[in-house]
Design a protein with these regions (language model features):
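Acidic/His-rich, divalent-metal-binding segments that scaffold phosphate/diphosphate chemistry
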Residues: 1-77, 83
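Detector for Asparagine
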Residues: 4, 11, 32-33, 96-97, ...
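Exposed alpha-helical structural elements
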Residues: 7-11, 15-18, 22, 107, ...
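Divalent metal-dependent catalytic cores for phosphoryl transfer on phosphate-bearing substrates
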Residues: 50-159
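Terminal helices and disordered tails flanking the catalytic cores of nucleotide-processing hydrolases
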Residues: 127, 157-189
């Protein structure tokens, strides 16, 4: 999908907006936040563009829908900065209902909704954080969550990306090391 996402949008935008009318609210919806330079719809497309063949369909679906409820959850602070409190939970609930209406299997619905729900957690650069989230959602889902965040950050303001990328890269390295350590323990047994 990555490099062809804007061709896809030109050819199929009207279709996806009819299939999922909630996306209509995202088109042109300004985020009014220094961390964002695109409206919600364009941000989503740029996040999809940042994916490659290593991203599975679960992760790509989560990226497509991760900010679908931002317009509904939009609030401005006293300085006029836009915030989207609760959009990840509202989005997960919406997508759960949508996917159930579409009769998609739980093997798609549950992991996609889980990724959407947790994509706004505060990421901490520590082994404890990695262990906690692997225990909570599993190794594969945690890696998908990190991949979603990498794509999400790629679609944000370049001025703020560097530090976010450093944390995500460190978490990926930590997860890989922890996985190798666990694999060695399993092999020894």
């Amino acid at each position: 999908m990555s490099k062809n996402v804007f061709t896809w949008e030109r050819n199929f935008k009207d279709i996806i907006l009819e299939l999922v009318p909630e996306f209509k609210k995202c088109v042109g919806f300004k985020q009014n936040n220094p961390h964002h330079i695109y409206d919600v719809w364009k941000h989503t497309l740029h996040a999809l563009e940042a994916t490659d063949e290593s991203y599975d369909s679960i992760t790509k679906l989560a990226i497509l829908f991760h900010d679908i409820k931002k317009p509904e959850c939009y609030r401005e602070d006293k300085d006029g900065i836009g915030h989207f409190y609760g959009h990840s939970y509202a989005g997960a609930d919406y997508v759960n209902n949508l996917f159930r209406f579409m009769c998609l299997p739980d093997s798609i619905t549950i992991p996609v909704c889980q990724l959407i729900r947790y994509h706004e957690i505060q990421f901490e650069d520590s082994d404890e954080f990695v262990y906690k989230w692997i225990d909570r959602i599993g190794d594969l889902q945690f890696r998908r969550l990190l991949d979603l965040k990498v794509a999400d950050v790629a679609a944000q303001n370049p001025l703020y990306r560097s530090n976010k990328y450093k944390i995500l890269e460190s978490l990926i390295n930590r997860q890989n090391r922890i996985r190798e350590e666990r694999d060695k323990l399993i092999t020894i047994k």
